[in-house]
């Protein structure tokens, strides 16, 4: 316990590993503790996209979308070997968002974030474009195509951790934080190796809680602070089915309930479909897609793909896999990325900074 780290980070997801890399790159001493493996939780259960959040434009979250799109360009330039462009087809569905609204939203999406290399939006005639072939005949005539990026989410986490370690950070997997106490401006942190059971102590000037859906557990059990009433867990489930189309573009489908559902080419022979959005209570480690969520996603794609004469309730998709990331929403808003930025200008006070999990 001779060394007192500048920053101790709890959580080995994309937030924790990203902070570790950033801090270590600035010359700060860093220790990161993850009770399981890197990206064992939400960060490997995502929709596997690097995107700006097109749907957030409807909520006038212009600053958020602009920042996300700008960071998309940065990430793509840093890791082009695991982040790749992906074209999305957005069919216009009568009775839902009007075509002018989709055009306006995609125009903003193209220009608000300083897009430099990705291809821009174009209008599609779905009666002649190959993207219209898998869709229900006669149901969709007009569509739009725009660009975002896809990513191997777990590998992105590991690469951040690897780079942080190369810059001097100590990355401790299978290491659980049991207790953290602050005295005289320094955090004393009790650690336990979950495999051997051995315990050790570390000290740090600042503590970052980046435990994702376990953030309140760390806050209350380890730090001894009261739980926050404005924190809620949100589950977004995905399913994997045999591929619904043969081309390499993805679909973003509108639902009558106002939500959107992605259908994305996945591992050559499959289609990834997601996501749902519901409140979650219980142990995040035991989260799984409910029958209702599976039915919701199957109905959503069945209303767009296949024979229009089929009843969505009786159309069966061969379910190959599913996963359900649990994210944390603060007061009903999406994950507050700005909390990460407090580390950019200088070390924060010797307090605890809590970060929600990545958005779904």
Spans of model-derived segments:
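Core beta-strand elements of the Rossmann-like FAD/NAD(P) dinucleotide-binding domain
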Residues: 3-5, 197-206
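Short hydrophobic core segments
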Residues: 10, 202-212
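Glycine-rich FAD pyrophosphate-binding loop
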Residues: 24-44
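Dinucleotide-binding Rossmann-like beta1-alpha1 core, especially the glycine-rich loop
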Residues: 48-131
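Helix-loop-beta segment of a Rossmann-like dinucleotide-binding subdomain
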Residues: 130-167, 188-191, 201-202, 276-285, ...
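C-terminal catalytic lobe of FAD-dependent flavoproteins
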Residues: 153-155, 163, 223-273, 279-360
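A conserved short coil-to-beta-strand element within the FAD-binding core of flavoproteins
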Residues: 173-187
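Flavin (primarily FAD) binding-site architecture
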Residues: 209-224
